[in-house]
Amino acid sequence: MPSGLICVARIGAPHGVRGAVRLWSFTADPFAVSDYGPLVTKDGARQFEIASAREAKSHLVVTLKGVATRDEAERLNGVELYVARDKLPPTEADEYYHADLIGLAAVTTAGDALGKVVAIHNFGAGDIIEIAPPSGPTLLLPFTNAVVPTVDLAAGQVVIELPNEIEGDTPNHPEA
């Protein structure tokens, strides 16, 4: 993938017979995806411009310039769309693009290495940070200020306050 690109949307199934497609936008404002100019595929080989967009249940329905039939739309199902990083707005304090977090080292508040950030997920109840340790299963933790008190992009790391359940601490009540 050409460097400096950020994934902002994924094309879904066709909608209707005139080439419209379902589009899942990964931007805070779903309609902002049409403000960034031409969107490109992961390999940079194809470029798309959004001609129109309207809101649907959990996605947008868009028409793309040059896509006029259902058959053309069907061939685009699953294509991820990217935009050059410099076209995105700057982040606010304590906001990050997921792409900036992937690959950062994860350390505990005591400075012990945990692994690397491999993904940020959102299953509907807030962001989840996925950390891959050098061995063993990955850790899935809430991406909150309580669990991730520090994100230091310049140092290339996130600091993790492991919940007691993960640290293996004993409960605060005696066993009966």
From Swiss-Prot:
PANTHER family: RIBOSOME MATURATION FACTOR RIMM (PTHR33692:SF1)
Principal subcellular localisation of the protein: cytoplasm
Protein name: Ribosome maturation factor RimM
GO MF annotation terms: ribosome binding
Domain comment, as recorded: The PRC barrel domain binds ribosomal protein uS19.
Gene source species: Rhodopseudomonas palustris (strain TIE-1)
Keywords of the record: Chaperone, Cytoplasm, Ribosome biogenesis, rRNA processing
Complex formation: Binds ribosomal protein uS19.
Function: An accessory protein needed during the final step in the assembly of 30S ribosomal subunit, possibly for assembly of the head region. Essential for efficient processing of 16S rRNA. May be needed both before and after RbfA during the maturation of 16S rRNA. It has affinity for free ribosomal 30S subunits but not for 70S ribosomes.
GO BP terms: ribosomal small subunit biogenesis; rRNA processing
Family stated for the protein in its record: Belongs to the RimM family.
Gene3D superfamilies the record matches: PRC-barrel domain (2.30.30.240), RimM (2.40.30.60)
Protein localization: Cytoplasm
PRC barrel domain: residues covered: 92-166
NCBIfam families from the UniProt entry: 16S_RimM
One cellular-component annotation, GO: ribosome
